[in-house]
Amino acid sequence: MPSITVRRLYQENQQKLNLTWVAGTGGSDNVIGNDDQRPTLALVGHLNFIHPNRVQVLGLAEVDYLNKLEQSAAKTALDQLFHKSMSVVMVANGQPVPRLLRDYCHSHNVPLMCSTLESPYLMDVLRIYLARALAVSTVLHGVFLDVFEIGVLIMGDSAMGKSELALELISRGHGMVADDAVELYRIGPDTLEGRCPPLLRDFLEVRGLGILNIRTIFGETAVRPKKVLKLIIHLVKANDQAMQALDRLNIQSETQDIIGVTVRKVVLPVAAGRNLAVLVEAAVRNYILQLRGIDSTREFIERHTNFLRDQENAPDID
């Protein structure tokens, strides 16, 4: 299962959450991860002595409760708490950290952090961050683009012209997310977010031209940091076998399953003289119309059916 360390959580959220590392630096490699019994949303929560969260957050009420406990009762409660598995403790609302809590975090190598943010907002941000950081992921070969604000993944065998097609679409004003290796993360039950590996960011490899820096050539608006995948364009060679298997009316929409998420798929035969960039734009426009309930294929079938019915019911003229 995916996991991250407390060090990474701190580094990526220090400024956003106004975090200060107070104690327990020896636990910087403590792991935060999912398991079958504890989904992502249950990893973060207010102080819980019975079923501690991986990320324990202390708000106004929790700190006030600890401060009001007698020394012996506080030690008993913290002994019970630190006997369980925790990754990090955070004190919210800019409150002073109870001395006893600081000592326990230091002795048990549990990172203790402070934030000036209110505890409900702090937990919301952490849950969203962990949902993305711990998302199930996979890597697919292709080019991921933003076409008319729709995330489009162009796939196909090697030397099918994916990069050339992407370059043409970028020159038409669309944006690139990733080339060659597309990282897909399941950030929701039916949502896949595509990103680019840091090493390949901004680069597009085109045969004959080499590696191009899209951001430098076309400007900042030509690249996107991430995009939700909505449509797959699969390029195939336009041979007799492929053309025979192709549904020309496209009555039954094709789909592809990616880590448990079903994504709409369009198969485009590649042949000399076909303007693939125009075809991709048309496929995306058609997809947008279908989202609005407008299906050109079904409209044509209904019109054809009505025409045949009218012909059958027309009176014979002798």
Swiss-Prot record:
Record function comment: Catalyzes the ATP- as well as the pyrophosphate-dependent phosphorylation of a specific serine residue in HPr, a phosphocarrier protein of the phosphoenolpyruvate-dependent sugar phosphotransferase system (PTS). HprK/P also catalyzes the pyrophosphate-producing, inorganic phosphate-dependent dephosphorylation (phosphorolysis) of seryl-phosphorylated HPr (P-Ser-HPr).
One Gene Ontology molecular-function label: magnesium ion binding
Documented EC number(s): 2.7.11.-, 2.7.4.-
Protein species of origin: Chromobacterium violaceum (strain ATCC 12472 / DSM 30191 / JCM 1249 / CCUG 213 / NBRC 12614 / NCIMB 9131 / NCTC 9757 / MK)
Subunit structure: Homohexamer.
Positions with a binding annotation for Mg(2+): 163, 205
Annotated region (Important for the catalytic mechanism of both phosphorylation and dephosphorylation), positions in chain: 204-213
Protein name: HPr kinase/phosphorylase
UniProt similarity note: Belongs to the HPrK/P family.
Region described as Important for the catalytic mechanism of dephosphorylation: 269-274
Record: residues binding ATP: 156-163
Comment text on domains: The Walker A ATP-binding motif also binds Pi and PPi.
Reactions mediated catalytically: [HPr protein]-L-serine + ATP = [HPr protein]-O-phospho-L-serine + ADP + H(+); [HPr protein]-O-phospho-L-serine + phosphate + H(+) = [HPr protein]-L-serine + diphosphate
Other remarks in the entry: Both phosphorylation and phosphorolysis are carried out by the same active site and suggest a common mechanism for both reactions.
Active-site residues from the entry: 141, 162, 180, 248
